[in-house]
Each structure stands twice: as structure tokens, then as C-alpha cells.
A protein has these predicted regions:
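A short, N-terminal "cap"/entry segment at the start of jelly-roll beta-barrel domains
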Residues: 1-24, 104-107
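Conserved short histidine dyad/triad with adjacent acidic residue
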Residues: 13, 26-43
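Short, conserved beta-strand element in jelly-roll/cupin
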Residues: 31-33, 43-58
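Short beta-strand His + acidic residue motifs that chelate non-heme Fe in jelly-roll/DSBH
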Residues: 38-40, 58-59, 75, 80-86
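Short acidic-glycine-tyrosine-enriched beta hairpin
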Residues: 62-77
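Structural motif
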Residues: 26, 55-57, 64, 80, ...
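A cytosolic small-molecule/anion-sensing beta-strand core signal
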Residues: 52-53, 68-69, 87
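Ligand-binding loop in jelly-roll beta-barrel domains
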Residues: 77-101
């Protein structure tokens, strides 16, 4: 199955589908309609965003990034972040639930 076929767009909405959910982390496919997003929040775990289709603006700790298809970014644990779909876009979100030192940086 192609990554872009894992989840379908829905008008005016954000759609998610959990692909893997285990104690050590999750892998989730998302489809955002244009203009949809996730308001600023924090997560206790590092999160890797892989853009499968379209474009997204991501803010991490007051720094802005624009990602397009084929690009990725790490949202470090406990750092405020938000997402806004520039166009319809799909992503894979990998949450890593691990204790210990965090070496993640955005790009």
C-alpha cells in the first residue's frame, strides 16, 4: 500500500489512523484538509513528522518551518509545537516513547 493511501481527506477536518500502537511508541497516518491544523501543545515524547503529500507550516518553540512532500522534521519532547496545513496534506507521525537523554533537534 502506498503511504498516501493509508488515510483519506475529509472536507474541513483532520483524519487520523493508528498504524502501530505499542508501549514503545506509535505510528499514525494523518490527512489534513487545507487550513486545518493542530493548535500549540507539548508532548512528553519526541515526534518525527514525515510529509507524504502537500505542505504544512510547523512552529516549534517560536521557530517556523515550512515542509513539503518528502521532507521531515523532529518535534522534540516537551517543546511547544503547532501545525497548519498550507494545502491539503498527509503525514506520518512517529512518536517515540523512550526515557533518557533527548538528542532531537528540529532540522
Amino acid at each position: 500500500m502506498k503511504l498516501r493511501d493509508l488515510v483519506a481527506y475529509q472536507h474541513g477536518a483532520v483524519v487520523s489512523r493508528t498504524l502501530v500502537g505499542v508501549e514503545g511508541g506509535t505510528v499514525t497516518a494523518f490527512a489534513f484538509d487545507e487550513g486545518q491544523g493542530l493548535s500549540e501543545h507539548t508532548a512528553p515524547y519526541d515526534a518525527l513528522v514525515i510529509v507524504v503529500e502537500g505542505g504544512v507550516d510547523i512552529r516549534i518553540s517560536d521557530k517556523d518551518y515550512r515542509l513539503n512532500e518528502g521532507e521531515m522534521i523532529v518535534m522534540p519532547a516537551n517543546k511547544p509545537h503547532a501545525l497548519n496545513a498550507v494545502t491539503k496534506f498527509k503525514m506520518i507521525l512517529i512518536m517515540i516513547r523512550a526515557s533518557g537523554k533527548h538528542n532531537a533537534s528540529p532540522k
